[in-house]
């Protein structure tokens, strides 16, 4: 079956470090039931119009299109591409990652998502909440919605340091939606965290946010604003007792960082939303920051190993193909 995957991926041009779309495409390329079409113009949305031989279009991150460079034009190309594909009899699968745009507070992302819901022949999501959200937000849509767990990036299990250096690690790109600043301010006044060592590491491209975090830092939080290599990141997670996620649950449904963290077999604490709630055997979920120090560090080894075994990237195209009868 011929499939086109948006956004297109060109390893020579894509420097974003987007592991998800790279693995997604490679999984379909490796499965003999699929033929991936991937003509890559400079405007990724124009790619839909250049790959109309595809029988199936799988579309990711529709909510981000309006905020791209020349967003209005990109949105136009995207709409034209979807309509042209449907006129040719292709089926449209929307992979719903977020409830809405994380950073674009205009109405444009929501309008495009509304339109996408009316055109999709099927919706896939990496969280049970995603299916509930889709049915509640788009009740007029007749498209079936299915939950497929987020695949893991590797089957390798990373060893832990003999003596942990950090009690908690917060890692990944730092932006306002991840509520790192809010957590730092909370922690500074929380006696239950005062005897903990907390590492925050990741690149923060927002200079104003970076400055605010530095002003708010208590002595027991170490802040490292830097882009870390895979090896550097793995070393820091391995040297930590627990992985902590402070995300704003308003828009998030699933998290690649959460899935990446599973291979360390560490206790994880995160907000009670989306895939964090789905993985309740692994993730200790909180409703507000005040609950974080009260949550026990549970043994997640068996549950994490089970998830890793059941959710490889190689299995993902097979799971999609099993739903073909509903398209």
What are these regions (language model features)?
Residues 197-210, 226:
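Glycosyltransferase donor-sugar binding loop
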Residues 235-252:
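Acidic donor-binding loop of glycosyltransferase active sites
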Residues 118-136, 140-157:
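Donor nucleotide-sugar binding/catalytic pocket of nucleotide-sugar-dependent glycosyltransferases
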Residues 243-244, 261-272:
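Short hydrophobic beta-strand element within catalytic cores of glycosyltransferases
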Residues 105, 135, 146-166, 179, ...:
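Acidic anion/phosphate-binding donor-loop and adjacent secondary structure
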Residues 290-327:
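A charged, aromatic-enriched C-terminal amphipathic alpha-helix characteristic of glycosyltransferases
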Residues 161-178, 184-188, 198-201:
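Conserved donor-binding/catalytic core segment of Leloir-type glycosyltransferases
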Residues 210-231:
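Nucleotide-activated donor-binding/catalytic signature segment of Leloir-type glycosyltransferases, i.e.
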């Amino acid at each position: 079956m011929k499939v086109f995957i948006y956004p297109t991926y060109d390893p020579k041009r894509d420097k974003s470090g987007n592991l998800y779309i790279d693995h997604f495409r490679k999984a379909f390329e490796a499965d003999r039931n699929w033929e991936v079409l991937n003509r890559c113009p400079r405007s990724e949305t124009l790619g839909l119009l250049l790959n109309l031989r595809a029988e199936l279009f799988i579309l990711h991150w529709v909510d981000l299109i309006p905020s791209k460079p020349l967003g209005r034009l990109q949105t136009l190309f995207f709409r034209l591409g979807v309509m042209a594909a449907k006129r040719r009899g292709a089926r449209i699968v929307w992979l719903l990652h977020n409830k809405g745009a994380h950073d674009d507070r205009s109405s444009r992302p929501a309008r495009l998502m509304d339109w996408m819901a009316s055109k999709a022949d099927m919706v896939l999501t990496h969280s049970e909440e995603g299916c509930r959200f889709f049915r509640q937000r788009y009740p007029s849509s007749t498209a079936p919605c299915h939950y497929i767990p987020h695949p893991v990036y590797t089957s390798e299990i990373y060893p832990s340091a003999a003596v942990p250096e950090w009690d908690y690690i917060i890692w990944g790109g730092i932006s306002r939606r991840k509520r790192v600043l809010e957590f730092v301010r909370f922690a500074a006044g929380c006696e239950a965290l005062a005897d903990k060592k907390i590492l925050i590491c990741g690149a923060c491209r927002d200079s104003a946010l970076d400055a605010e975090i530095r002003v708010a830092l208590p002595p027991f939080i170490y802040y490292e604003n830097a882009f870390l290599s895979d090896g550097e990141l793995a070393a820091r997670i391995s040297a930590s007792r627990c992985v902590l996620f402070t995300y704003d649950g308003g828009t998030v449904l699933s998290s690649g960082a959460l899935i990446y963290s599973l291979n360390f077999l560490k206790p994880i604490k995160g907000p009670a939303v989306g895939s964090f709630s789905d993985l309740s055997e692994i993730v200790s979920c909180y409703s507000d920051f005040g609950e974080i120090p009260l949550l026990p560090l549970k043994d997640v080894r068996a549950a994490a190993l089970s998830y890793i075994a059941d959710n490889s990237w190689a299995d993902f195209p097979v799971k999609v193909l099993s739903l073909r009868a509903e398209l």
